[in-house]
Amino acid sequence: GDPFLRF
C-alpha cells in the first residue's frame, strides 16, 4: 500500500 512500507 505504502511505497515506504512496501505493502
Swiss-Prot record:
| Subcellular localization, as worded in the UniProt entry | Secreted
Q: In which tissues is it expressed?
A: Kidney, skin, mantle and the hemolymph.
Where does this protein come from, organism-wise?
Answer: Planorbella trivolvis (Marsh rams-horn)
Gene Ontology cellular-component terms listed: extracellular region
Residue numbers carrying Phenylalanine amide: 7
Residues spanning the signal sequence: none
Principal subcellular localisation of the protein = secreted
Family in the record: Belongs to the FARP (FMRFamide related peptide) family.
Name of the protein in its database record: FMRFamide-like neuropeptide GDPFLRF-amide
Which GO terms are recorded in the biological process aspect for this UniProt protein?
Answer: neuropeptide signaling pathway
Identify the keywords attached in UniProt to this record, alphabetized: Amidation, Neuropeptide, Secreted
Does the record bear Disulfide bond in its keywords? no
Q: What does this protein do?
A: Appears to be involved in osmoregulation by affecting the kidney, mantle and skin.
